[in-house]
Amino acid sequence: AAAWMLNGCLQVMDSRTIPANRNADNVDPALQTATHLCFPTRPVRVQDVRAFILTSFGFGQKGGQVVGVAPKYFFATLDEEVYKDYSVRVTKRSKTADRAYAKALMSNAIVKVQDHSPYEQEDQSRIFMDPLSRITEDAETGSYHFDTKDIRNVADVKARLTRLVRGERLNARPDAASGLAQAARSAQAWIEKQTGGRSSVDTSTVGIDLVDLSAFSAHENETFIERNFTEQEKAFAKQSLDQKMAFASRWAAKEAVFKCLHTQTKGAGAAMKDIEIVKSDNAPQGQAGRKAGLEDIQLSISHGEDCLIAVAIGIAGNGPAKYTL
């Protein structure tokens, strides 16, 4: 609804015409005392529209306001060189858009409806379970699909980690960027060690999870701890000097292993006790059911100043489950 209203406000600013509401024939008398409110029954042409304000009320008592200001006031703040550069780019963009619109009109394809899913049926659960899966467009046909190379193996796990960190950096606080980069470098080094620097490895699944420690407070929730951590995990965390870090790292590891296993989820509130992260001599070790056809799951937890990244790589196979992580 807000997007619909925003489009209308932009049209008002562009056309300098206030639209009519011919159905507003019973305005509450209490509103008639507000002299700054106007409910026109016919379109009103004005000389200029300098700004507008849009208010949207959503479900759950959540709402927002948008203030739109006429472009000329923005352009007036730009240096001449910056304005000229912008003018060149916007002219080029407009010409490209005009050509695309004309082509769509002539081919009767303004709205392109795809009559099939962008993924194969056997890949559906992998797509939905992988937060890093991305759709791509076929330049020749204009159809959309998921790249099977991106979801059926982990040869590009380093690229996937890079995309995740890049996305988190956009949302991170300025003072958290260095810690995120530190954790990413540590995770990258572990991946290089596990893959031996090869461009592809004999893997089938991957799970990556990132936790912002400044926003993590689940360790204070006893119900959360009871539902998601085993007795051994709780004992380990409560013996740690930093219980928050201990619970956060185990939780990130559980999430990464869960994504790696590609098991059918029971919902966002499902307990995670079925996956246990225990401490071994060399690295954290995960214990979980053999439902994903994996012989081994390699797991790493990398720490930054105020965040941590867990990476789980699943090794395909039908042999005895090692799960030496």
From Swiss-Prot:
InterPro entries: 4-PPantetheinyl_Trfase_dom, 4-PPantetheinyl_Trfase_dom_sf, Ppantetheine-prot_Trfase_dom, Thiolase-like. One of its GO terms (biological process) is fatty acid biosynthetic process. This is Fatty acid synthase alpha subunit hexA. Pathway: Mycotoxin biosynthesis. GO terms for molecular function: 3-oxoacyl-[acyl-carrier-protein] reductase (NADPH) activity; 3-oxoacyl-[acyl-carrier-protein] synthase activity; fatty-acyl-CoA synthase activity; holo-[acyl-carrier-protein] synthase activity; magnesium ion binding. Fatty acid synthase alpha subunit; part of the fragmented gene cluster that mediates the biosynthesis of dothistromin (DOTH), a polyketide toxin very similar in structure to the aflatoxin precursor, versicolorin B. The first step of the pathway is the conversion of acetate to norsolorinic acid (NOR) and requires the fatty acid synthase subunits hexA and hexB, as well as the polyketide synthase pksA. PksA combines a hexanoyl starter unit and 7 malonyl-CoA extender units to synthesize the precursor NOR. Disulfide bonds: none annotated. Belongs to the thiolase-like superfamily. Fungal fatty acid synthetase subunit alpha family. Its EC number is 2.3.1.86, 1.1.1.100, 2.3.1.41. It catalyses: acetyl-CoA + n malonyl-CoA + 2n NADPH + 4n H(+) = a long-chain-acyl-CoA + n CoA + n CO2 + 2n NADP(+); a fatty acyl-[ACP] + malonyl-[ACP] + H(+) = a 3-oxoacyl-[ACP] + holo-[ACP] + CO2; a (3R)-hydroxyacyl-[ACP] + NADP(+) = a 3-oxoacyl-[ACP] + NADPH + H(+). Keywords: Fatty acid biosynthesis, Fatty acid metabolism, Lipid biosynthesis, Lipid metabolism, Magnesium, Metal-binding, Multifunctional enzyme, NADP, Oxidoreductase, Phosphopantetheine, Phosphoprotein, Transferase. Mg(2+) binds at D209, S302. Induction: Expression is positively regulated by the dothistromin-specific transcription factors aflR and aflJ. It comes from Dothistroma septosporum (Red band needle blight fungus). Pfam families: ACPS. Signal peptide: none annotated. Acetyl-CoA binds at residues 209-211, 255-265, 279-282, 301-303.
